[in-house]
């Protein structure tokens, strides 16, 4: 199934982890994937591998999403060269966890600048190109923690902001063939989670109704649906991809 044949898909933070899984998913379905990451070596290496494996053009780009002028220039250059921008996935983000009184100004601003401001800058940059063709899909990454979580005030503020940004964006573009949605991942299998000791890991998994962690593949599948033509009547939602954890459980 090639839902993205000839489409241009932009993925920020697209060179590693969940971003890499999504970049691969879109490439396997025929998209030209523009992989943006501050780690240009990782981005270009992944793009080269995906292009070799899928036969579809993939490119790596050094993009700092906190630089609004650079983001706009990147989007404009891609649109001019490729003739279109169909999909934006706002995945770039960082974590600087601490109690509120121990979060310094730098760590507060760093998290919001990358996750929230970066998502805003990227969405603003691609909108003119989507509007001109009457089609677009924007998916931004929130988190199950957007409702509040101990020791993550900066992260929670950013992820809650993404929910508000997504809903407002969905309203503003509702009659322009563009949708905007957010994904809120739960506990996803990552190197950090895998490194946890057995009891601590088991305690977390016991809170998940499905009794397993999610995988990058789970996230990539969710993104591939929301960004597809089939999801044209889905807009303004927060899709929990958490194995049911958000039904009523909380992490302590």
Task: Give the positions of each predicted feature.
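Short C-terminal tail/terminal secondary-structure segment
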Residues: 3, 235-252
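The beta1-alpha1 cofactor-binding region of Rossmann-like NAD(H)/NADP(H)-dependent oxidoreductases
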Residues: 40-41, 62-73, 105, 217-218
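Substrate-binding pocket helix/loop in short-chain dehydrogenase/reductase
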Residues: 99-100, 107-112, 204
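Active-site loop-to-helix junction immediately N-terminal to the catalytic Tyr of the SDR YXXXK motif
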Residues: 103, 145-157, 168, 196
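Active-site helix of classical SDR
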Residues: 123, 158, 166
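Alpha-helical segment proximal to the catalytic Tyr-Lys
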Residues: 128, 171-172, 232
